Amino acid sequence: MRIRKRLKLLALLGAVLAIALVAASCGDDDDTPSVAPAPEAPAEAPAPAPAGEDPFAGCGAGAVIDPSDLSVGRPVARCEPGYPLPIPLAERTTINMSSGFKLEFIAPILLAEAFGEFEKENIDFNFISLGFSDAVSQVGTGDIDLAVGGTEASLFNAVDNGFDVRWVSGNFFPPDAGDRTIAQTGVWARADVFSDPSNPDIAELEGTTMASAVGLSSVIAYPIAQAFRPAGLVLGVDVAIERIPSTDMVLALENNAVQSAWVLDPLWSVLADAPDEYVLVTTQPPGEPIGGLYGGPSCFEAKRDACVAFHRAIIRTINTYLTGDYHQDEDVVAAIAEAIERDPEQIAATPSLLFDWEIREGSATRAQEAFISFTASGETVVEFDEPFPEDQVVDRSLYLEAIGRG
């Protein structure tokens, strides 16, 4: 059994060398490969709207979902394929966007570039390889227009320091988030921690050690803290944190160096193959993106029209190519594989992501509350003791305008 697990783990490691925080939808991994050559767009790629045609005609009632809906299996916002139609900018404009990753969770952006959707909006796209915590201050000064990241401590600390940086659109959530009976990214633990592994009591994690790639400042700490709260546990106090690279977490669990870990795609499949030894304890919150794009003064002022056009392009890419089980579409998988420099088989081996450009109500507040609670651990994660109001850290207007709801 252990030999088979190790062989499978070695086979999977190649798919995750750059995934320190994919489950967090963000991070500071700067080892990002260069942009791959653009694959040829499928024939059905939309063209600019003909004169007189409503560019938002395909964005009906389903293009906006009640932001308070966090239910398992809730609908996600969608327009018809090809919508919203392009509305080219009057002047060629460059959008400078940073990301510490070039991985599948930013496929809407990478495929918008590869399939010419930015070109249709008269946008030049400049990809900057930079982790979120390093980029956020440059977003605040307007040197970077948009940053891929997570709703993490560095965002709120930047706001606390006077920068006007806001979460402007979401990214994705695992389709089965919230259903612990389905193996997926989440907190996995050794079965021998629990008196009844078939129904694990989170309270029994008290006194154990959890592996984390980043620590308490990552947005992943939010869903973990949320799961621990009903059991009366505080991450960093009742459950110790040990920083371990994501690719080493399975072996750390196997060797009992840690008793739990947030395990990413596709490494959790090794643990799922040994249900008598490991159990899934909690997942990402259901129906809730916890990362996405973050904008500052340039998107709110001088480049607002371009930032709206950028969102129009990525929303159109989601509606056209990345809806449903898109891993069944060989052309789309091939395009993603080329853009992120991975094998198509590695991509197809994991579930398709559920892309969601919307931001749920209260997500930013709940994340702040988690970071504030960590002061009990003796580690200063944020330097304020009350959450900022949502309208100071969230701005939904760019994506709403992109679908004709501005």
Q: What are these regions, as identified by a protein language model?
A:
Residues R2-L13:
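Bacterial N-terminal signal peptides that target proteins for export
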Residues L12-A20:
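Hydrophobic helical h-region of N-terminal Sec-dependent signal peptides
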Residues D54-L70, I372-G406:
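Conserved C-terminal helix/tail region of periplasmic/extracytoplasmic solute-binding proteins
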Residues G27-A49, F56:
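Short, low-complexity, disordered segments immediately C-terminal to signal peptides
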Residues T247-E338:
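Pocket-lining segment of extracytoplasmic ligand-binding domains
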Residues L21-S25:
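C-terminal motif of bacterial Sec signal peptides marking the signal peptidase cleavage site
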